Regions:
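A short beta-strand structural signal in non-transmembrane regions
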Residues: 56, 163-164, 225-252
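A structural signal for hydrophobic secondary-structure junctions
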Residues: 61-64, 71-224
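Alpha-helical transmembrane segments
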Residues: 28-58, 63-64, 362-365, 369
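Hydrophobic alpha-helical transmembrane segments of multi-pass inner-membrane transport and secretion
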Residues: 13-40, 286-321, 344-357, 401-409
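N-terminal Sec/SRP start-transfer signal
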Residues: 1-32, 41, 50, 333, ...
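Peri-transmembrane interface segments
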Residues: 40, 241-305, 314-316
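Short helix-loop junctions at transmembrane helix boundaries
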Residues: 352-400, 412-416
Length: 433
């Protein structure tokens, strides 16, 4: 019987084309909408993680408590030993990267070597020179480089493009970094500006300076010492699991603290934070999740309403067929059951085609992206100019369920009208058709 119904659907275009087209369009739109919204939001999280917080962050609690002061004397020593511990006590798919957050005065000399301009800068030291480092790719420095090159030699730096313009710095110019060392003393070291970058975040473009990790350790007397260990998950890892991983690492840290490395200070207390604990990202996640649920909920409800009406209209046009089948002796409930099976077939077929179309569009936006740099240029959000969608199982589920449910429900509700009409009236509609 099922094969018979299936063949009947394809042979009768009035029962096939319109309902399946409505289901296909609705499911495709939901899959594409969920993928786009998920991609924009996860793009913002990944951008923030890459530039600043990491998905996970191991930091000394005394440093974190006074982070706005960039207290290098509260950094965490035993860099090599810490890396070994992280690799043995955390998930194997987490990639850990050491960084140094520093703050200093940037002194720009005139032709005589005297101070011409000075400004406070926010600095980040990371591994820019190692061949096996992911940091250059992670921060998209090659794509963000407007002029010059990335640091290759000793004591070279790249700075934000707006910072370079405000200080009137040219490529190859020597500048002096004035700051505090790990021991609390004053340091002054000369660097050569070799590149200008555009991060796409106004605050960073105006104040950010990037130098190599080894150069920073030499300048600030921080051998085998860093301020942060940033952990990065693969793109497929959902942010809802960050907290569980963080808690597991903190549990292991409590054991490690009892037998700490010899280079740690007595009051060093390393802690692990997730991105949700920093930069107010946690509250933003809750707000975005609520807004996404509301928008998708409204859209899904409207889609279900349209599909429901499509099922009702399809059923109304088949009242004559229902009367004929009743006249041949088919029972009311068997008739409703077979029509419901047809609605299920239509819902499944439409959902499959809709998933293919919506998934293809989402995959295209995930691979190619959509340039929205002009829209985000003044927003201050840490988000890429090129917005990419994200193909997720959740998007397919949110499209398939209303697609199938609405098709079946609309068909069954329209079919219930046969209880209110006589066979003669239903048969008369067949004659009128």
């Amino acid at each position: 019987m099922i094969v018979f119904l299936f063949r009947g659907i394809f042979r009768d275009k009035s029962r096939f084309l319109f309902p399946i087209s409505i289901v296909t369009i609705g499911v495709a739109l939901v899959v594409a909408l969920v993928g786009f919204m998920e991609g924009v939001f996860m793009g913002m999280i990944d951008m923030t993680a890459n530039l600043d917080t990491g998905h996970l962050r191991l930091v000394n609690k005394p440093f974190y408590d006074e982070e706005h002061l960039r207290p290098l004397d509260r950094s965490l020593a035993a860099q090599k030993e810490t890396l070994k511990w992280l690799e043995h006590n955390t998930n194997s798919d987490i990639k850990w990267a050491p960084r140094i957050r520093w703050g200093a005065l940037l002194d720009v000399p005139d032709i005589n070597g005297n101070t011409k301009l000075q400004t406070p800068v926010v600095g980040m030291a990371l591994d820019l020179k190692s061949s096996d480092s992911f940091e250059v790719k992670r921060l998209r420095l090659v794509e963000s480089l407007l002029k010059g090159k990335l640091p290759l030699s000793k004591n070279e730096m790249v700075i934000g493009n707006q910072l370079a313009q405000s200080l009137k710095i040219s490529l190859g110019q020597s500048v002096t970094v004035l700051g505090q060392s790990f021991d609390g003393g004053l340091v002054a070291d000369n660097y050569t500006v070799v590149g200008f970058v555009k991060f796409g975040v106004t605050a960073m473009d105006k104040k950010m300076v990037l130098i190599d990790l080894i150069d920073a350790q030499n300048t600030f007397y921080m051998e085998d010492t860093v301020t942060d260990w940033l952990g990065y998950f693969p793109p497929s890892f959902n942010f809802t699991n960050y907290v569980d991983v963080k808690n597991k690492i903190n549990f292991n840290l409590n054991t490690w603290i009892k037998t700490p490395p010899k280079d740690w200070a007595k009051d060093d207390i390393p802690i692990t934070l997730s991105i949700l604990d920093q930069q107010n990202i946690g509250s933003m996640v809750k707000t975005f999740t609520l807004i996404k649920s509301f928008v998708i909920g409204i859209f899904t409800f409207l889609m279900m309403l349209v599909l429901w009406n499509a099922g009702v209209l399809s059923g109304i046009h088949r009242y004559g067929e229902m009367g004929l089948r009743l006249a041949f002796g088919e029972s009311h409930w068997k008739l409703i059951f077979t029509l419901g099976i047809e609605g299920l077939f239509i819902g499944i077929l439409g959902s499959i085609v809709g998933c293919i179309i919506g998934g293809t569009f989402t995959w295209y936006l995930q691979d190619i992206g959509l340039n929205m740099g002009d829209a985000f240029s003044k927003s201050g959000l840490m988000i890429n100019d090129v917005v990419r969608a994200r193909l997720t199982l959740e998007g397919f589920i949110q499209g398939i369920i209303p697609g199938i449910f609405s098709s079946v429900t609309g068909t069954i509700i329209a079919s219930l009208a046969i209880f209110k009409r006589s066979e003669a009236n239903l048969f008369r509609e067949l004659e009128a058709g």
